Amino acid sequence: MGINFDVSRPKARSSINMITKFHTIGLIGKPHHQGTNQTLKRLHHWLTMQGFEVLVEERVAAELGPNIEAVDLLEIGARCDLAIVVGGDGNMLGAARVLARFDLGVIGVNRGNLGFLTDLPPDAFEEALAKVLDGEFDTEHRFLLEAEVYRHGMLKASNTAVNEAVLHPGKIAHMIEFEVYIDDQFMYSQRADGMIVSTPTGSTAYALSAGGAILTPNLQALILVPMFPHTLSCRPIVVDACSTIKMVVSPDNGENLEVSCDGHVHLAVLPGDEIIVRRSSERLRLIHPKGHNYFHVLRTKLGWGSKLF
């Protein structure tokens, strides 16, 4: 006897690629950007003509014209099966920090520069996206970080990051002093411009610019990258993703320190504060066109050499 699975309701969707069609699609983009608006208009028309219910993030909906259902990111997360982010990696990061708490897939259309997280071309997305919407896609889960600032033992601020959490001096560049602990075991003290704690996703971003190694996305690891350390022996270190990173700021530092999450959210840090960075329970479900190859992306985006023979 055959089993009849009802996939008509969005509630029944799975975190793996078992459902062949999406139902409700959310569009998210970079506000006040002409190229992004053009792509969003094409996407909205194309998806609507195919019978999908389409919701548009409220910051860009007003720029697309009338008869657009405008909602916030939380409603997109709650109602949609798929979110399409049009823009660069920064736009993807901003959306991902909100959408990771929901069970929906996220795919990107690149309207930025490198676009490590945005797979689809803006001028010819139809063919690849049609296959994705018909169930031909690869699913990849990326874990997030949770950063917390404690003062006198009390939690003062927290947020999540897809790429990295960075302890730095704030608006004025200067050396800061802090201690670093891994799972409550003292590792070292630092005199540096700051510290980057990065996920594998973020290893091709700020951490790479600071001399860190590239971690493949499937690794369950974190990389700690000191920023301009005042020593010749301090190098980036990779630790298990289950590790808890604690940074204790010296009381002798100035008062304008910050922890930045993906460069978007800034948490104020005072001398003597403790910063805890650990893996979040939230995961981003990235959707890629079938056959996505991470090393092809690296080779293309970073200008690596092609095959010799």
UniProtKB/Swiss-Prot annotation:
Keywords: ATP-binding, Cytoplasm, Kinase, NAD, NADP, Nucleotide-binding, Transferase. Its main location: cytoplasm. Pfam families: NAD_kinase (PF01513), NAD_kinase_C (PF20143). InterPro entries: ATP-NAD_kinase_N, ATP-NAD_kinase_PpnK-typ_C, NAD/diacylglycerol_kinase_sf, NADK. GO terms for cellular component: cytoplasm. One of its GO terms (molecular function) is metal ion binding. NAD(+) binds at residues 89-90, 163-164, 174, 191, 193, 204-209. The active site is at residue 89. The keyword Cell cycle does not apply. It comes from the Bacteria. Gene3D superfamilies: Probable inorganic polyphosphate/atp-NAD kinase, domain 1 (3.40.50.10330), Probable inorganic polyphosphate/atp-NAD kinase, domain 2 (2.60.200.30). Its EC number is 2.7.1.23. GO terms for biological process: NAD metabolic process; NADP biosynthetic process. The keyword Metal-binding does not apply. Its cofactor is a divalent metal cation. It is an enzyme of class 2 (transferase). Belongs to the NAD kinase family. Involved in the regulation of the intracellular balance of NAD and NADP, and is a key enzyme in the biosynthesis of NADP. Catalyzes specifically the phosphorylation on 2'-hydroxyl of the adenosine moiety of NAD to yield NADP. This is NAD kinase. It comes from Shewanella baltica (strain OS185).
